[in-house]
Structure formats: C-alpha cells, structure tokens
C-alpha cells in the first residue's frame, strides 16, 4: 500500500474507489494499491 498525495490509475485494472472519505486504488496487481494521505 503506497500512501500518496495524488493517487491515479497505473494500469487498466486499477479502480478508484472512496471508502470512509479516503480515495483508494485497488487492483489485481498488489503493487498498484494506493491510498490518499
């Protein structure tokens, strides 16, 4: 899980979702997981 100021999709399978007021990226590739800090 990378914590970044700006999150973006890295590949086609990345999905931007909002959980509890945070923006997350979930993907089939675990390296692409991100959270906005």
Swiss-Prot record:
Major localization class: plastid
MF term (GO), any: structural constituent of ribosome
Keywords: Chloroplast, Plastid, Ribonucleoprotein, Ribosomal protein
A GO BP annotation: translation
Any GO CC annotation of this UniProt entry: ribonucleoprotein complex
Tagged with keyword Chloroplast: yes
Annotated TM spans: none
SUPFAM superfamilies assigned: Ribosomal protein L36 (SSF57840)
Subcellular location: Plastid, Chloroplast
InterPro entries noted in UniProt: Ribosomal_bL36 (IPR000473), Ribosomal_bL36_sp (IPR035977)
Source domain of life: Eukaryota
Family indicated by similarity: Belongs to the bacterial ribosomal protein bL36 family.
PANTHER family: 50S RIBOSOMAL PROTEIN L36, CHLOROPLASTIC, LARGE RIBOSOMAL SUBUNIT PROTEIN BL36C
Protein name, entry field: Large ribosomal subunit protein bL36c
Organismal lineage: Eukaryota, Viridiplantae, Streptophyta, Embryophyta, Tracheophyta
């Amino acid at each position: 899980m990378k914590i970044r100021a700006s999150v973006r999709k890295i590949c086609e399978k990345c999905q931007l979702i909002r959980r509890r007021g945070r923006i997350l990226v979930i993907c089939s590739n675990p390296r692409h997981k991100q959270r906005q800090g």
